[in-house]
Curated annotation (Swiss-Prot):
The gene is thiC. It comes from Yersinia pestis. One of its GO terms (molecular function) is carbon-carbon lyase activity. Residues 15-25 have a biased composition (Basic residues). Its EC number is 4.1.99.17. Its cofactor is [4Fe-4S] cluster. GO terms for cellular component: cytosol. This is Phosphomethylpyrimidine synthase.
Amino acid sequence: MSNNTTSLPAENSSHPRKGTPIRKKQREEAQQFINTLQGVTFPNSQRIYLQGSRPDIQVPMREIQLSPTQIGGSKNEPRYEDNEAIPVYDTSGPYGDPQAKLDVHNGLPKLRAAWVADRQDTEALASVSSGFTQQRLADEGLDHLRFEHLPRPRKAATGQCVTQLHYARQGKITPEMEFIALRENMGRERIRGEVLLQQHPGQAFGAHLPENITAEFVRQEVAAGRAIIPANINHPESEPMIIGRNFLVKVNANIGNSAVTSSIEEEVEKLVWSTRWGADTVMDLSTGRYIHETREWILRNSPVPIGTVPIYQALEKVNGVAENLTWEMFRDTLLEQAEQGVDYFTLHAGVLLRYVPMTAKRLTGIVSRGGSIMAKWCLSHHQENFLYQHFREICQICAAYDVSLSLGDGLRPGSIQDANDEAQFAELHTLGELTKIAWEYDVQVMIEGPGHVPMQMIRRNMTEELEHCHEAPFYTLGPLTTDIAPGYDHFTSGIGAAMIGWFGCAMLCYVTPKEHLGLPNKEDVKQGLITYKIAAHAADLAKGHPGAQIRDNAMSKARFEFRWEDQFNLALDPATARAYHDETLPQESGKVAHFCSMCGPKFCSMKISQEVRDYAAAQEQAAAQAQAATPTTAAQPIDITQPINMLQSGMEKMSAEFRSRGSELYHRPANLSAEANNEPT
């Protein structure tokens, strides 16, 4: 990025909150973040690229460098054994490459532009198709807000379908599919250590998890509808990724401005921040002013797929009056967003007129914003949902730009009391019907799920979805497993997310600490993402996804060997891990200490285990040397009790040490310090 200070466009607003000191500070901080934006990676990590079959297929990974393990020698001449670097999945795009030149005013490099052009089945449009977009472009009063370098939108050529599902069904392996295969394998072919490659068998609940993911396997899964590649031809900046239960569990982050808070620069900041902390996709749920302009800035700077809920913007166009929505206006909104580059639309097309009365006896009614909008429209007109009625036309639009459909659960339960009720599953069955229609047009589909569901009722959600939605990928909000923890709903939902991810859910929509309370800020986004990356990883481990345990094994080895710096660097959040450690052991000596602050130097279980192991090994070596010096015959039996006796001897020695210190579990720090210095206590 240029060193010159630049500014994102300022929004003019008469809203009173915009002028408050807190709002001003937030915007200034976001502007500073944008001004100083440069590619960065985590401590002791480096960006690497896995090369594909053509020069422009380069898959980014983050490689965590580890320190060597001391395996012997003396204090003055120690002997070391190298530890392998650990490659990990990286969603940060160019923002995670210290060599990248970044400028949000120009946007990211168009990674996929050549791939789209090479297929020769699209054409650049002479002008935008959306009447609303034409109005915005003609409004000179918006020039100060507009992304300056607007690309010309593309569309499928006449008679062509440009979806990844269409190519997959034709037997074509696209560059996107090859990119994904390399990415999903996470570079684990680079790992050679037997300890790192050990993994417990998983329980996959019917998922098929091959040892090595190939581009052909990716093609097969997409062709079968079990996975989607959200990749609008007008969002060439995005790096290909896949959502499906036979792949790594993915995480979505929600961002977006509202009528009372946030600005364009803050949303761009949240986008970059989200990709840094592991968001596989990002949904722009903006409902405030300048939705169109905000989305353009986000898309041009996003290395991950972007999803939206188009009904939110359509509602803004009718000043929030749901009854005034029309199909024509909504269709124009779809064209507007498809030509900007939105990768997937959430549509609440399964909220049917006859299902609305089913929610009357619920404790919390209809809690989905999109679901309530469509329910109100249906009741006010006493007509069927226009999204359902015009679903085939929607599919035709999506097929022309490769916009995936995320069929929304507008009747999801908003409390555990309402979980798994008649309305929820009636809508789910309708989403299965719509899935088949979308597939007729080669449009990619995933299914959205709840919501609030107690643990014992979660698995049924997965089995119902697989059966009635024909194994299309499932994408759930949590689910939250209890309703008693406002402020901690990233925890209540993370529990449910880990469970449903294990059962086969393909993507988890994060929940932040602000759920039910307010709009998330930057720190809330991080907390939600870390929680959900834990849930997704736990699900991958439980399923037995090949290679999922490598990072865990590396962490455990570093922990046992007291390699503190490696423990920090292998963590999902290295800075927090280091900060917690340094609260009690801030000195540099604490980074090499063979104990932690919980047990201290005199009662560390791992230190004791190492001492016992070393003692037993020394005893065994001495016995072997003695035996080698004694003539034996081939018929002499081997004494298998010797190693056991040696271990017992080691344990007895440590027991004596424990008793000699007074048989106390814990010791005062002053006493430990005095003992270490041979002072009286």
